[in-house]
Every structure is written in structure tokens, then in C-alpha cells.
Amino acid sequence: SKGNINLNHQGKNLIQFVNSRLNQQPLGYIETYVDFSKPVKTVNAYLQPDCQHCLATFKFSHKEQQSAVNFSGKNFPMTQITALLNVPNTLTGNADFNIQLALTNSGLTKGEFSFDAQNGELLGLNLLDMAAQYLPINYNSDLTASRNMNTPYERLESHLLFENHLLTVDKIRLKTTALLGEGSGAIDLDNVQCDVNLTLRSTNEKYKKLVLPIRFFDSCYSPQYKVNIDQNFRHQLKELIKEKLK
């Protein structure tokens, strides 16, 4: 990457990078304004990767031992977001996002994360293959043409909260060609353990009442799962069969 630094004797500086990279991911053009002339030190950065209509802003402020970060963007590649956050890449696609962090002595104390991602894949998890064993979904050749361990999705919304080393998954909403999903849970960041409950249903209106509950647990890199075939699911299935036999 190439850079340009414009220093100001009053403590206000401009730093520019072209073709920048972080954690092996291209970040494109970055323009950063640094102001250390006041009691509250600030850094404002604008990121523009080599993609259409995508932009992100990074705002950092620091006073004494307290710091605050706001990182937000529109239509930003998820692979670049995970690279910037230095977290495992489990998702592709582009997202509108907003991240707010509070730090004390450079240690993260609280955080809030909102993502609205579109047209990507959940990596390492094939929900379609899993749900097709229990739900009457449109499991045709188009959907299974590239049978692998990923889940293509049309839209994925999530809202997460961080406090005391625990990341609470407040909301997950998922839409794929054949499935709708909703869920919540928690992630222990110390040992990267996940515990998430997700309900799946078919996008077909005929079967929307049939809801499949699944619990994902253990390592976030390769989660185990348990399908909860409870009395409620069996009752829904019986009612569906009765309707089909009429």
C-alpha cells in the first residue's frame, strides 16, 4: 500500500492510504483525520474498498482512561469487516452495519453490534441439508447443485451485545431461498464457545406453521447441533399430514 501523511503543528493531522490491506484483506482507500490538540483525542477515518457503493466510517475518541469507538458502514464486504475486527470469518456477503464499543485502559468493557447482510453464505454450516431431513422444503437440484458445508442466504439480520467477556446474540433473522430462521443465544469469547437456539421453517406458505427448533453449541468454529423434536413439533407434523390426507 501507499501512504501520505500531512502533519500540522497544531496537532491536527491527515493520513491517507491507497490499496491498503489488513489481515490479508484488501481495504482500498483510507483517509484518516487525527486531532490530538484537545483534551479529548479523536481519530476519524473513512474507508472505501474496491467495491460498488460501499463505504465505512470509523470514529475514535479518548480521554484519560476512557475510549469510545463507532464503526459503521453501508454495503460493506463482511470479509473486510471480520478482518478489521480480527474475528473468525464465518460469513460472506455485503452488510449495512453499526458497531459501538466502550473501552477502559484499552480493554473492551461494553459493545453493541448490528448487522444487515445480504446475498452471501454462512460458512461451515449447511442449514438446508440439516432442515431437509425434517421439513417439507423445496430441496431441488438448483439448491443442491453445489452441495457443501455452507448455507447461501438472501438476507441475515443480527443484533449482539457484549459485556463481561460474553457476547449475547439478541436477535438473528435469516432468509434463504427455502428457509426462514429466527434465533438468539450467547458466545463466550474467552474460549470461543457458542450456544444458540434457532427455529427454522419453510418459505412455502403451505408449511409455515411447521417450526423446527435447533440448538447449536460447543466450538463456534465447528458447532455441534441438536434438533429438538418435541411434542409441539410432532403435533404440528400430525396436523400437516391430516390436512394433506383430506
Regions found by a protein language model. Give the residues of each.
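Gram-negative outer-membrane assembly/targeting C-terminal domains
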Residues: 229-246
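Short, structured coil/loop segments at alpha-helix boundaries
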Residues: 124-125, 140-143, 204-207, 242-246
